[in-house]
Amino acid sequence: AQGSRALAQMRLEELFADARWLMSARNQKSDRKLSASRLQLRAIWPILKREIPLVLTANRAGDISRALAFAKRQQIRLVISGAAEGWKLAGPLAKAGIPVLISVDQNLPSSFDTLESRHDNAALLHQHGVRVIFHANGESHNARSLRPLAGIAIAWGLSKQAALAALTHHPATTFGLKDIGRLAPGMRANIVLWSGDPFSLKPR
């Protein structure tokens, strides 16, 4: 939503209130004016039913706190994307069981929202028990860079086991892909042999 943070939050609250109202069978044929089309509001139903998580982009600690409060009020599953200042709220994120989607090469501020981003964000979040997931800034064509980028997080304190989970098991479990993401009986998996450290640029 365009405008201030307060306006964006108000808009989100309105959308979820209307989506929840529309879920009631007795309201299906009502002519009440809604904040979005019925088709758009129905798209929110799987979130309200906790079938899928809501992914919210939030980088500032204050915005992350507001996202946590919103998810608690709505009783929905939440994933925080960005989380440049997630290290400041590692405890509350872990307590609430909220996973975070982070870009490990986001060490320099790209906006005022990311002024306090740091390389060891992933390590600090993991130390507190937060489920960390790596992404390539939302650009699918950069997915090939995730493996060496995970090496940056390792260089700044994240264990190799945790980095591997951030690329495999954690995204799979967070988004409901129950039969992939780890090596175990009954799971679908590929086994890859590397010529060296898979998190460096050199091995093939």
Write out the residue ranges for each language-model feature.
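Polyanionic/metal-chelating signatures
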Residues: A1-L78
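Active-site-adjacent beta->alpha loops and helix N-cap segments on the catalytic face
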Residues: E85-K95
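Alpha-helical scaffolding segments of alpha/beta enzyme cores, especially the outer helices
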Residues: E14, R66-A69, K88, D120-Q127, ...
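Short, intrinsically disordered, charge-balanced linker/junction segments flanking boundaries
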Residues: A1, L201-R204
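Short acidic active-site motifs
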Residues: A43, K88-L89, N121, R182
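Short internal beta-strands
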Residues: L78-A84, L101
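A general structural motif
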Residues: A36-S37, L56-R60, G82-A84, S111-R118
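His/Asp/Glu-enriched, well-ordered alpha-helical/loop segment
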Residues: P53, A94, P99, S103-G196, ...
